[in-house]
Amino acid sequence: MARRRVVITGLGPVTGFGIGIEPLWDAMVEGRSAIKRIERFNPCGFPCKVAAVLSEDQLIIRKLVPKSDRKATKVMCRDTELAVAAAGAAVRDAGLITKAIDPQAAPTIAPDRMGCHIGAGLIAADVDELTAALWTSRAADGRFDLRHWGASGMENLTPLWLLKYLPNMLACHVTIIHDCQGPSNTITCCEASSGLSIGESMRVIQRGAADACLSGGAESKVNPMAFLRQHFAGRLATTRDDEDPTAVVRPFDPNARGSVIGEGGGIIVLEALDSAEARDADPYAELVGFASTQSQCPDATGLEAEPDGGGIADAIEIALAQAGASPDEIDALAPFGSSIAAIDQAESAAIKRVFGSRAADLPMVTTVPNVGNCNAGAGGVAVAVAAKAMKTQTLPARLNTTGADGLNADAAPSRSADLRHVLVFTTSQGGQNVALVLRRMD
């Protein structure tokens, strides 16, 4: 039996610019960045003091869920709130009716034919929630003691504490709110999570196990514990109080000095083409290629891709083969573009290996300078921007980079472009790589 064709019918990014594709797209075209000094907590003890975040009035979760689900918001961590907001935006953008949109109306997609695959990260608990438990877990010398933690410390955590911070809670809440009863999964592979989730949804629809899926990822590392982990991993730029926060991230720049955290992500509606046609939907693009690989990570910590970009290049080549497209048919690239020197080097090497002399001319779409590194949600943002670019036949502006060696990645204004195929690829902190090929709807 022939595989079903899969299209993107709804976009739901959530970034420092707000909820939905329009605020993000407008900012990308205009060349604006949401990166600014952190206000959610005091960042003075950290070398990096900036991030891209949603303000409190941009995301009021109780206003974004049906009344019947508002009680559940008490056990939603920030990551879950982002995913719920993104899923709601994607559903509305796709013109779907779900239980959350109208509980009295018949759903557009039968619940048992609606899947959900969401990428998530290692969710850090709020420091305030842990303080009492940690305080009572001290030994006589004042140091943390695991025996005290088990005997008395955990008694100071709320009974549902664990259910707030499990990574699969993002998909759990989204599926409950929208009554998605089809195939569901959570993927936790750092920055590759969104792309891997989208690829899994694609395969689920191709083999006929679902007619549509909510897919992508979301994460927030804008809290002291998660921020500290990223600092120890050497991934964050050191910032100065007198510099422009929006100019810190410079992907593929010879002077790139690290990345900046962004909270957010993107969830899209993937749908079988026959389902989309039956309801007269207007897809953004067709998803025609997907591949994943694992880099060998030769260094002791295992945090970065190998310098020659071999694993990344393999993912790109396999995705192109699945799409039936040659490297010469790709019109634009949307890489991770993190501004982390080792990752930039690996991505650059992979691009040059696959595309040869074309690498210097292929335009890039970079999102991290605009919205920060959304980690598990990074690929979801990139796919949403790439799909919108294909629909509008417009390349968004690029920020900050100068002197990219052999790549078309320097800062540039937005412009019209003939985009038939766009390649989106991401490598992760653990060396997982994912590549997706989008094709224009003709």
Where are these regions (language model features)?
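Acyl-CoA/ACP chain-elongation machinery
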Residues: 39, 211-257, 290-307, 335-345, ...
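Condensing-enzyme catalytic core mediating Claisen C-C bond formation in acyl metabolism
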Residues: 5-9, 36, 241-323, 331-332, ...
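ACP-dependent fatty acid/polyketide chain-elongation machinery
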Residues: 1-72, 94, 274-286, 384-399, ...
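Glycine-/small-residue-rich "gating" segment that lines the acyl/pantetheine channel
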Residues: 138-157, 199, 203, 218-277, ...
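Active-site nucleophile and cofactor-binding loops and adjacent substrate-binding regions
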Residues: 42, 75-81, 109-111, 161-167, ...
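Active-site-proximal alpha-helical scaffold in enzymes
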Residues: 83-96, 167-171, 175-178, 184-219, ...
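Short, well-ordered amphipathic alpha-helical segments that serve as non-catalytic structural scaffolds
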Residues: 83-95, 272, 306-324, 350-354, ...
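Conserved beta-ketoacyl condensing-enzyme motif
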Residues: 8, 29-178, 182-185, 218-227, ...
